[in-house]
Every structure is written in structure tokens, then in C-alpha cells.
Amino acid sequence: MKQRFVLDTTALTDLQTREMLEIEDLCQGMRAILDLIAESRLHLQISCYVPFPSVYKELHEFAKNNGCDDEIIAMIDTWLVKKTPDRHEVKIPSHIFHEYVSYMRERINKGMTVAEEAIREASIQCLSIESEIEDTRKVEDNTDREVIGPIVGKFRNKYRSALRYGILDSAPDIDVLLLAKELDAAVVASDYGIQKWAEQLGVRFVPANTFPMMLKEYLRHTPSDGTHQK
């Protein structure tokens, strides 16, 4: 059976993947992966899809915002098959939605706990500063500079970790899973949320940092005449 993969944006932009390929530049990393996809398409009839327009648009914007040249854009358009997932016909078991709602509730509660801890920490710090400085204006300035800023930064990181880790938090994430389910394809991503729910849906998952090596291994076993074995 012909191999099919559905790519998340992270399939082309993942830092760990570039490190494994020993490439520092993001655009060159994207080029290297797209070259492997092109060779696999020509020699092995492996097809790599991206949901349209969600992930396709993300890839275009990511490439342009990071200064990638027009050749990278052309490679995206040429070697990645654009397809809109059939959101009406793809059937997902109801227990998946039930579990997802429960999981989201748990994450929201964890996020609330992080927020409460940040508020308590800020209050304690403010009171300790206020007890040492009588000038209200100085208290406000010192609080903003020494307390609120660092705590808000720490709070944001903790909140993202508590609330977003392991969830599907964007339309492109959902589109990737729906399209993979529709095509009976494997998902390629470095997003734990996509991985977790791919497993729930019975969709094969390929980590982004192993995908290029997988393609290289396929190509290494391609007969020298360029044909593929069936």
C-alpha cells in the first residue's frame, strides 16, 4: 500500500530535527526535508499532505517571516499535496470527545491553580516591600520592576505548561488529525497534543525528528534503477 503522511507545521520547522540533520539555519532545514520528500515522491510514490488552508497557510507565513527565499515556497507548493479535510464525513467515536472534555477540564483547573499561586506570591512580595518603603510611588515602581514583571513572566510559562501541554489548541492541529484519519495516513509532528490524540484516534504518529531519517532509510533501499518494489 502506498505510504501517506500528513504534515503538521512542526514537521518542517522542528529544532531537534535540524540538530539531527546538523543544520543550523531554519530555511536550509526546511529545504533539506522538502528535498527528501521530493525524492520519496519521485522514487517511492510516497505522498505528503498538508491540510488546506490551515497548515498550508502557516507554512507559507512561517517561511516568509523567517526570510526563506521563493524557492522554499515553490517547494512547499510543489511537493506537499494540499487537501481540505472532510470535516463532515470523518467519524470520530463519541468517547474521544468525552475524554477530551474531561482532559480539558483537568488542564483548566491546573491553570487556575498556577494563577492562584502567582497571585499569592505577588501579594507576599508586595507586602514585604511595602513594609520597608513608605513612599507609595517608590513602592509602585519597585513592585513593577522587582516583583510583578518577573512573576508575570514565570506565571505565563507555568500557565502555558499547565494548560496547553497535551491539548489540541488550534484549528490546524485538528485539521491534521482529521485529514490523517480520512486518508488512513500517518501524522508527522513534534506536538505532544497531536501525538496524544493521534493515539486516541488510532492514527499512526511519526515524530518530526525521526521523519527525515525514515525517508532516508526508505530511499537507501530503493533499487539503483530508481524503481520501487511493490
From Swiss-Prot:
Q: Specify the protein name.
A: RNA-free ribonuclease P
Please, which domain of life does this record's source organism belong to? Archaea
NCBIfam families recorded:
PRK04358.1-4, RNA_lig_partner
Q: Where is the signal peptide?
A: none
Which is one GO molecular function term here?
Answer: ribonuclease P activity
Question: What are the BP-aspect GO terms?
Answer: tRNA 5'-leader removal
Q: EC number(s) in its UniProt entry?
A: 3.1.26.5
Q: EC top class, in one word? A: hydrolase
Q: Which Pfam families match?
A: PIN_5
Assigned protein family: Belongs to the HARP family.
Please indicate if the UniProt record lists DNA damage as a keyword: no
Q: Does the keyword section mention Hydrolase? A: yes
